[in-house]
């Protein structure tokens, strides 16, 4: 069975190529990608001390003023009493915000499916290069493995705080992690968080709450520019769908899910059928599922956004009469990128992925609407 997990991309390892049924079983359950970080100051503004001392190298993220904070989340509370110097992030997107705040991870989850030739996600790699970080200080690539987060591996990093606001850590994992350091989990449900809340949570935990508005404002300005330059986008609605192979169900991402939120922020309207499916959310996916036999519920949607695990997955889906007959599929009003890095980057809204993604996204959307 071919499957696309809403939050973790299909890998390219031998196991994923040869055992997709096994992957399908674990992909829609709690995932455990690991991103570990310690602080390394880079010249990204507002992170150094005012006295001009050299703060390069591992250590404090700059400045001694820090107001203790308590962050309440679904699994408990994280009391952070001192400015973190060794930060671990789990799940997706939080490491990018840390980088935008001037903190370079010393360890990052190995994300083969979306990585460039260096082994890093390209927007992360570009940020490291742009900031002149020595290769010896690049994050170490860490594999989470099938079992998810390893508390033993995290313990080796001696963290001051563990950030997992967009993750799927379980209560058992949380108990192990919080024994190591204050741990911030998701606000309410696994793998579900508003992108603004994620940025604010990470910034607050790192003693940079005042900069959260700056980062959010910068992202909103970029979205606004796209809408102003492409007013025609507002004339069309969309649904962002995924498939679980020819014999599995289909899914539609809800508006709060970050990849759907990105498209909406670029100017398209959420299709009514998506709004109607909010009550059918499958916990831990920020999406709702429906049978392929009912694919015609998408017939009134102007533009469909989707992605496939590979060309074989695309072909098997388009060969299905019920799927191939959907209006947008039939007309070609579909945005279905084949670049694994883009699929990954466009699934997250944060200070690094948005500028990297939107210039690539706009031409795809323009092409899709020419088919309407």
Positions of PLM-derived features:
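Alpha-helical, coiled-coil/dimerization segments enriched in small aliphatic residues
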Residues: 252-286
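A short, structured surface patch at a secondary-structure boundary
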Residues: 95-151
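Ligand-binding pocket segment of bilobal, Venus flytrap-like solute-binding proteins
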Residues: 272, 279-311
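Structured C-terminal subdomain patch of bacterial secreted/periplasmic proteins
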Residues: 298-372
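Extracytoplasmic substrate-binding proteins
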Residues: 77, 176-247, 347-372
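Proline-aspartate-enriched helix->loop->beta-strand connector
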Residues: 154, 158-164, 182, 295, ...
């Amino acid at each position: 069975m071919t499957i696309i997990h809403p939050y973790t991309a299909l890998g390219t390892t031998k196991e994923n190529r040869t055992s997709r049924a096994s992957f399908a079983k674990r992909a829609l359950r709690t995932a455990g990608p690991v991103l570990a970080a310690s602080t390394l100051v880079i010249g990204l503004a507002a992170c150094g001390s005012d006295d001009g001392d050299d703060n390069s190298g591992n250590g404090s993220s700059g400045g001694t003023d820090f107001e203790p904070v308590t962050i309440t989340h679904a699994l408990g509370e994280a009391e952070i009493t001192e400015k973190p110097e060794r930060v671990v992030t789990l799940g997706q997107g939080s490491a990018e915000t840390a980088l935008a705040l001037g903190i370079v991870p010393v360890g990052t989850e190995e994300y083969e499916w979306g990585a460039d030739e260096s082994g890093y996600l390209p927007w992360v790699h570009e940020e490291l290069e742009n900031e002149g970080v020595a290769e010896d200080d690049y994050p170490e690539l860490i594999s989470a493995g099938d079992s998810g987060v390893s508390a033993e591996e995290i313990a080796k990093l001696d963290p001051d705080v563990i950030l997992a606001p967009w993750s799927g850590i379980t209560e058992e994992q949380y108990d192990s992690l919080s024994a190591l350091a204050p741990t911030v989990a998701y606000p309410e449900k696994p793998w579900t968080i508003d992108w603004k809340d994620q940025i604010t949570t990470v910034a607050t935990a790192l003693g940079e709450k005042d900069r959260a508005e700056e980062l959010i404002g910068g992202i909103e300005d970029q979205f606004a520019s796209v809408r102003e330059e492409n007013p025609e986008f507002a004339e069309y609605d969309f649904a962002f769908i995924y498939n679980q192979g020819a014999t599995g169900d289909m899914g539609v991402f809800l508006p709060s899910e970050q990849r759907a939120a990105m498209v909406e922020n670029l100017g398209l309207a959420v299709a009514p059928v998506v709004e109607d499916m909010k009550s059918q959310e499958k916990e831990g996916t920020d999406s709702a599922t429906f049978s392929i036999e009912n694919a015609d519920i998408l017939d009134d949607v102007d533009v469909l956004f989707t992605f496939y695990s590979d060309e074989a997955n695309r072909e098997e889906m388009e060969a299905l009469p019920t799927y191939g007959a959907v209006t947008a599929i039939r007309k070609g009003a579909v945005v279905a990128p084949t670049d694994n890095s883009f699929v990954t980057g466009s699934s997250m809204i944060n200070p690094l992925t948005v500028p990297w993604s939107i210039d690539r996204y706009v031409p795809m959307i323009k092409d899709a609407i020419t088919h309407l």
